[in-house]
Design a protein with these regions (language model features):
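Short acidic/polar active-site loop segments enriched in Thr and Asp
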Residues: 3-4
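Short, basic, glycine/proline-bearing loop/turn elements
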Residues: 7, 82, 141, 163-170
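Conserved short loop/turn motifs at secondary-structure junctions
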Residues: 8-15, 81-85, 174
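Metal-coordinating catalytic core of metallo-dependent amide/deamination hydrolases
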Residues: 17-149
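Short, acidic/turn-prone active-site loops that include or flank metal/cofactor-
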Residues: 39, 113, 170-175, 194-198
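His/Asp/Glu-enriched, well-ordered alpha-helical/loop segment
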Residues: 135-138, 142, 182-214
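A conserved active-site cap/scaffold subdomain adjacent to cofactor or substrate pockets
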Residues: 150-188, 192-193
Length: 214
């Protein structure tokens, strides 16, 4: 079974304190985890962006204090979450840059899951997705990018040069009918994930393999 969870959490009606609730659950059942809140403006604009960043920072600092106290098992870690580039304006990316710098954590973001994400970035910012994130110092060896189906060759080169990670989510891509990532062999640091569609990684491996053979 699963012993570890990497989580990209969203609860727009419950932002502040939500990651602590998750941590309590992980500690209760004894699972290792790394979690974050997916910063976005898609429900409540700039206020939601600010609250999401604040929750990520608060939780990272809570983890730092918990590690020093050693009164609880060290099972849960933090990273800095963002939903997707098309729901995080430059003001939000600047907040995330400061959060990454302040906490020493990496960014966890879904990018290029659909072609729209890329088109939006080109239309509004005139940049490829990861090039835009890199402008805010958000692509490094601690960065986790989910999906990446429509990353450009330049973005893939950037991802590899910065030693960042890409997570392939075969069943989620099939379920959302977004296509297939044909550049997996070009990725240096590649991992397999589920995007929350299940917890059976052996099943995920089977789908990833057979879809690749399709």
């Amino acid at each position: 079974g699963c012993t570890s969870v990497i989580d990209h959490h969203a609860s727009p009606a419950y932002i502040g304190g939500s990651l602590s609730t998750l941590r309590d659950a992980f500690l209760k059942v004894g699972l290792r985890a790394m979690t974050c809140f997916e910063t976005t403006d898609r429900n409540n604009g700039i206020k939601e962006l600010q609250e999401g960043v604040e929750e990520n920072i608060r939780f990272a600092r809570l983890i730092d204090e918990a590690k020093k106290a050693t009164s609880e098992p060290y099972l849960v870690e933090a990273h800095i979450g963002a939903h997707a580039p098309f729901t995080v304006p430059d003001a939000g990316l600047e907040m995330l840059r400061e959060a990454v710098k302040a906490t020493g954590r990496g960014l966890h973001i879904h990018a290029a899951e659909d072609l729209y994400d890329v088109s939006y970035s080109h239309h509004w910012y005139g940049k490829d997705l990861l090039a835009r994130l890199a402008q805010f110092d958000l692509i490094d060896s601690k960065t986790l990018v989910a999906h990446g189906l429509y990353l450009s060759k330049d973005d893939i080169t950037l991802l590899n040069q910065r030693d960042a990670f890409l997570v392939h989510n075969a069943r989620s891509n099939m379920n959302n009918h977004v296509g297939y990532n044909h550049h997996l062999s070009d990725i240096r640091n590649l991992a397999l994930g589920t995007d929350g569609i299940g917890s059976d990684m052996f099943e995920e491996m089977k789908f990833a393999f057979f879809k690749h053979r399709d």
